[in-house]
Amino acid sequence: NVPGDLARPARAVAPAAGAPRVVVADFSYAAAPDGVVGRDFDRVRPIVWKGEPGKAMADLVAGVLGESGVAAVRLGADALGAEAVPVRISGGIRRFEVNTRRTGGLSVVTEATVSLTVTAEGPGLSGPMEKTVTSSTSLSDLFVTPDDLREALMSTANAVAEEAARKLLEAKVVSPSS
């Protein structure tokens, strides 16, 4: 089992000032039965995370946008009030997994992959903009612990959130609050 929730590394960043410019809705995610997010091929068992990837990834993307100076708020997928915000970010998680396998000898490799498609919509945009971001992480050790699984998944999820925010900023879909 993968313990805990996904989180951003602690940073000393003041929240963006002003009215929210972006709302980040929960991302869609087709969850596997019983929270399975991967496989331990060495011990022939599933890897389970009881978290909610769609909400966790939306939290991470909103967090990165906030760290970048964008006044962003989080709402559920069907939350009311999103119409009043200039840009709505939504999307779907295409891949969210962590697997382990022995690579010969004493080494065990833990690999995590996250793929996210973000869609930006709003009255100020010429039309919906869609970007897909994927990242993978690989860790090697003598044995794997639940914390190793979490670290691989958290590192990969944060890298995807950072890249998604970077692409939104570069495309000038969102911008830091002044």
Predicted regions and their residues:
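Generic short beta-strand segments
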Residues: 26-32, 92-99, 134-136
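Surface-exposed short loop/turn segments
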Residues: 1-2, 75-128, 139
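Generic detector of contiguous secondary-structure segments
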Residues: 6-14, 72-82
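A structural "domain/chain start" motif
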Residues: 1-60, 168-178
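Short acidic, glycine/proline-rich loop/turn micro-motifs
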Residues: 35-41, 101-104, 142-146
